């Protein structure tokens, strides 16, 4: 998530490449790392927590109460914002990009969230290039989510460094 970037692919085509804001690490609310599948999608949702009640136009949960959604209240995305003014774990996305993803994603779509330098079991791999330069299907092979989810679309967020290199959900 250090790159604060998300890429969204459908049928092998890159549809979205955007900066995002992920979970607030200074408050111990960092976004989850792993391979997930989209639960469902919903418009005009109200996200609720102990200290907030926030309406969003596009809600796409993939890990408990964590998901991808628009963040109309933000004027900036990317950089180090997540360290002090990040989300409660969700992937805050610019409105137009959240809309594009919403219109093209289906329940069961794999979502890959990672930090640069994450150990994936085969040594440490720093992913600093967009997913189209890697074989994402090979990375998903063998996971429970991948075997039950469709492979038409892949949402990915990258939380590596603020150099703008990745957004599969990092």
Region roles according to the model:
Residues 1-28:
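Cell wall/extracellular polymer interaction/catalysis modules
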Residues 19-25, 40-49:
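N-terminal post-signal-peptidase region of extra-cytosolic proteins
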Residues 30-35, 42-170:
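Exported/periplasmic cell-wall-interacting domains
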């Amino acid at each position: 998530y250090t790159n604060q970037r998300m890429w969204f692919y459908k049928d092998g085509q890159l549809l979205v490449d955007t900066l995002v804001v992920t979970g607030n690490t200074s408050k111990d609310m960092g976004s989850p790392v792993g391979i997930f599948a989209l639960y469902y999608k919903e418009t005009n949702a109200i996200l609720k927590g102990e200290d907030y009640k926030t309406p969003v136009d596009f809600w796409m949960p993939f890990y408990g109460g964590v998901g991808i959604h628009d963040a109309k209240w933000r004027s900036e995305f990317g950089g180090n914002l997540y360290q002090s003014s990040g989300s409660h774990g969700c992937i805050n996305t610019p409105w137009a990009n959240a809309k594009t993803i919403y219109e093209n994603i289906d329940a069961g779509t794999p979502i890959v969230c990672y930090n640069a330098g994450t150990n994936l079991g085969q040594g440490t791999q720093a992913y600093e290039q967009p997913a189209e330069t890697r074989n994402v299907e090979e990375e998903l092979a063998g996971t429970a989510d991948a075997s039950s989810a469709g492979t038409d679309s892949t949402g990915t967020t990258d939380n590596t460094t603020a150099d703008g290199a990745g957004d599969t959900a990092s």
